[in-house]
Amino acid sequence: MYQLGLREFGENRDQEAVAKVDKLPKDIKWHFQGGIQSNKLKSIATWASCIHSVDQLKYAQIISDQNIAVAKPIFIQLSLDEPPESRGGVDPAKLFDLASSIEKLPGISLQGLMAVAPLTSPLNDSFARLRAIHDQFKAVYKNAIYLSAGMSGDYEMAISYGATHLRIGSSILGNR
């Protein structure tokens, strides 16, 4: 993929990324897209150019505390599940409060939202809801223009609803 000109890659496990980052070309921008564990976040902040799955203020605070020379781009993970937050992500009703708190932290640049389509709702409805929330979010947070949504099974629909970042690892690498 690198030979084809791609320079941005995602990883959802810290240990796997750490093993790759030092061995692969330095011009690669790594995105962390997996579930965050507090004990791994300091490591993730050292190699990830962007962290997509921040869903709690304490995680943003840990990133902020790393005193990184350049603000670390992050996305807030939004829950589209019912009940909210059952599979990770912040409840949409709490999104703006969380973003307001994160925005005040030094060393963080709020770039957008990330979401995983719920298992129980029609995809069209979920992506339409996500787009509407993202549109409202961008109206308040002008730099939060990116939308990380869509995986191997639904990325085409996610693109049609405004996704700018996709997570299609299993289509490329196969299932784990």
Which stretches of residues belong to each language-model region?
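Expand to "…catalyze enediolate/carbanion chemistry for C-C bond making/breaking, isomerization
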Residues: 159-160, 168, 172-176
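Conserved alpha/beta-domain cores
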Residues: 1-153, 161, 173
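Glycine-centered loop/turn positions within well-structured domains
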Residues: 156
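Conserved, well-ordered active-site substructure
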Residues: 165
